[in-house]
Amino acid sequence: MKMSFSKSCLSVLLLSFCLVLISAEIAIAQKSIVADHPVNFRVEPPSWWAGMNNPELQLLVYGLDIASTDVNFSYPGITLKKKHLAENPNYMFLDLELAPDLKPGSFAIKFMRGKKAAYSYNYVIAERAPGSAMRKGFGREDVVYLLMPDRFANGDPSNDNMPGMLETANRSNPVGRHGGDIAGIRKHLDYIEELGMTAIWINPLLENNNPAYSYHGYAITDFYKIDPRFGTNSDYVALVNDAHAKGLKVIKDMIFNHCGINHWFINDLPM
């Protein structure tokens, strides 16, 4: 009985010691992940608009040990209602309330440790385009042209292979990237219009920086940036303007229930 009790105690002590070691290794690894992370500080959404119908805005903030900082900012018409912390101390969520008379502009959000700003972010409140709230979506009266941008038309071969992108174009690979882009779509708007279409549904154009199998666009790694192999955010705006000038609606394909394996927060999850 004595021997059995001693063995049990020893087992518990060994298990406890192992758990302490594992916990320490996880903590060290977590800090190492953030220190080596390509995105050491981030605020999403990176900007917003004045005059939105919903007065609530939540910001996701990421930075090393951001949870230990105090938030400091001052801007007329914006109030910090609540700060949420996650299990991971590298995350913070800010609930902001926007006044109906909020004016466009910018302000510094400072994340303070004592009297020193550990991080600072210049947040832009843009002016909303006139008539934005009156936009009409697509309906049963529309004839929709669905296209996959990588497979549609290559209007700018110079962006087929871009610095920092893990996959390069290879038209001989049936599941690889083939080089289609926003420029190719813009050059073929007349073709789509002549078919009798009234709307274009474009598969996601946002960044899919994965080593393979992401030509379809549904493995997003940045929800706020057009994939450079398709073009730029400005190119997308120009595409929409060109389409509208021809009476074509543009349906933005958004994916909210998953992301690509190389999305920045996958290596350091909030929970």
Stretch-by-stretch model annotation:
Residues 30-68, 121-130, 134-135:
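Beta-strand/beta-sandwich contexts
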Residues 11-24:
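Bacterial N-terminal signal peptides
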Residues 2-14:
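Bacterial N-terminal signal peptides that target proteins for export
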Residues 255:
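Conserved strand-turn element in the central/C-terminal portion of the radical SAM core barrel
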Residues 115-229, 233-248, 258-259, 264-267:
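N-terminal structural segment of carbohydrate-active enzymes
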Residues 25-29:
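Sec/Tat signal peptide C-region and signal peptidase I cleavage site
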Residues 30, 52-115:
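Immunoglobulin-like IPT/TIG beta-sandwich domains and homologous Ig-like subdomains
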